Swiss-Prot record:
Keywords: Plasmid, Signal. This is Uncharacterized serine-rich protein YubK. Residues 26-76 are annotated as: Disordered. Residues 26-36 have a biased composition (Low complexity).
Length: 129
């Protein structure tokens, strides 16, 4: 995934827990990350193992649905997550197509996600289409 797409994904999603779990899956090993002397102190680095534990509780719920979807007052994340998936999963869509995805309804966004194929995001951090 290109860095531009990654930052757009973070901007639209805003899910730090999902970001943490995806960063852990891409690192070589969490134990070396946790004990790295580059942080200058012992213990957990900012967003370390505690963040991964939070991500497993909040993102990777049984059934793959985040806990936020159960709160009826938080309807906005559905749209932002779908848009996030469209940006993160379909880096091959031309720039004009991406602008159209941002400007149109969620149904068209979902259509682009289906056309894009498998997604690079962790399976538990987005709602199924």
């Amino acid at each position: 995934m290109c860095p531009e797409c990654f930052f757009l994904m973070l901007f639209f999603c805003g899910y730090r827990a999902c970001y943490c779990s995806s960063s852990f899956s891409s690192s070589s090993s969490s134990s070396s990350f946790r004990s790295s002397p580059a942080y200058g102190f012992s213990g957990r680095p900012p967003g370390g193992a505690g963040c991964r534990e939070r991500s497993q509780r909040s993102c990777l719920r049984p059934g793959g649905l985040p806990s936020l979807t159960r709160n009826p007052g938080l309807q906005r994340p559905f749209r932002s997550r779908s848009l996030c998936r469209a940006v993160a999963c379909a880096p091959g869509i031309p720039a004009k197509g991406r602008r159209d995805v941002r400007g149109n309804a969620v149904s068209q966004t979902a259509l682009h996600v289906v056309a894009a194929g498998p997604c690079s995001l962790p399976a538990g951090c987005h709602t199924p289409v």
